[in-house]
Amino acid sequence: KGVRKALASRNMRLVARGNYARNLTAVHSALFTIRKAEPEAVVMVGAYRPNAAFIRLARTFELDAIFINISFVGAKALAKELGTAGKEVVISQVVPFPWDTDIKLVSEYHKALSAFNKDIEPGFVSLEGYIVGRLIIESLKRLKGEPTRENLLNTIYTSGPFELGGINLSFAEGDNQGMDNVYLTVIQEDGSLQSVNHLLPLTKKPVKDNEYETILIE
């Protein structure tokens, strides 16, 4: 739904959709369905093994498209599974780049991580956990009355925003997202991840009037 909503707001539409059975890596049918539409981008919603299988197979069949994964996939796991086939695969993230210490929050995260264990590698999951921990601590400081679940949630929903290392988090009843920011990363040839700091315009294929094509696999 999120992909469709984002596309509609930009006068774009899906041109194909492929599916695979959960917990399997049989993605051939999805690939052949999608390949016929000649998409410029494939938005992938799934676990890292089937997504990696799809990308490798797509490259074998010379599908010239940008492969975009959401953070659920697990960036490091996907990069490792893909190997050299992972070059230029894009992954969205819900937290800033964990190695960008120019961001105050990330710098504070590095200091906390190092103080706990200098041998632990920074990562997206632990940074997200650090942010949640900071949020809970700040919420408890603001909480009035007994520290019950109800009072804690009420504090989070009504006393925001929460400023954590230069980044603001806001919550409300029915809105537990905290941040509306989306951070993009791209897999490098050596399997490492790099932050995407700016986007260049793509040459799109017009379908009808101002509509452009994209596709979704899930």
Label for each model-derived stretch:
Residues 55-130, 193, 199-203, 207-218:
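Extracellular/periplasmic periplasmic-binding protein-like sensory domains
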Residues 113-126, 137-196:
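Segments of small-molecule ligand-sensing domains
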Residues 1-62, 98-107, 111:
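Extracellular/periplasmic Venus flytrap/periplasmic-binding protein
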Residues 52, 130-134, 178:
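A structural signal for well-ordered alpha-helical segments within the folded catalytic domains
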Residues 20-23, 47-48, 71, 129, ...:
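Short beta->alpha junction loops/turns
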